[in-house]
Amino acid sequence: MPDDKLEVALDVMGEMVFAPAFAELDAEREVVLEEIAMYEDQPQELVHDLISEATFGTHALGRPVIGRAEVISSVSRRVLSGYHRSMYVPGNVVVAAAGNLKHEDFERLLVQVQRRAAAPAGKGPKVRPALVKPPPPGLRFQRKETEQYHVCVAAPGIARSDRRRFAASLLDGILGGSASSRLFQEIREKRGMAYAVYSFASQYTDTGQVGIYIGTREDNVGPCLEIASEQIADIAAGNVRPEELTRAKDNLKGRIMLSMESTSNRMSRLGKSLITDTELLSIERIMAEIDAVEPEALAELADVLLAPEKLSAAGIGPDEDRFLAAVEHVNPGLARAA
């Protein structure tokens, strides 16, 4: 917002967060149910919910962010109000800002907002327990009459505070995080087996997730996962080329530098640091950490995080047997136990 509207904006946000009216609850319920229905018709997105459930089981990280239709349909105003009273308290709220403002003035405005909104004092309960030990690898499949199979293979990753996070980002870039990555080149560019193929990596407070996504026709599911398995094994064996690592480092550093041109990204960076209780590193320190990553670190991470016996799998498509046959290429034990 314009910097001269900061006080007004904080007043509105404070009222929304600490004193919502919960008006038009039934209408909003219908909107969310429509959003869930729309999501169900997008298998390339839905499969990511399935792989989270396969990876994290019944833990909160395994649940869809948008919620489930049966819960949204039945939740009452009383339940929502009770949850809000216990969780939306100042001790649980992180406020981050970036732009033309002074820290002291911002703090003063926040205190005023809290008073005007009559926000309760104290700190609420934790939103979720820590993931002490990940569950065994899981398998999820949803049968749909789709033209393509949408497949994710993933495993628990590393926390946002882990020193190896820079190596993990580079591993993601080399494996499938860009148009020059191995999976994109081997599966799409050289063989034309898929339009969408990529790797992904998320880092949370106490764990993370690493994995790959492939959307392809039935005949290509097995060969695509076989290629993915081969590329993971090749990186784990230490076969990262010097120019490959240099390109990944340049790409990662460039994206970080470009992101710093956005005030919104700077704000998000501050907020994530507070939420996850991690050190806020200077840009110079981040660049140095990226430059310091050696090929051996990538090999070790690939070997530890993406070992076949640790991989979960999720798929959406017409035939579960075809999906299970393909999964044998990445985690034979998981497929045979299904």
Residues covered by each model-derived region:
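Flexible, small-/acidic-enriched active-site or ligand-binding loops
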Residues: 137-138
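Active-site cores that bind ATP or allylic diphosphates and position pyrophosphate for catalysis
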Residues: 134, 187
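Charge-rich, well-structured scaffold segments of protease-associated domains
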Residues: 1-124, 130, 141, 146-151, ...
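Helix-start/capping segments and mature chain N-termini
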Residues: 170-173
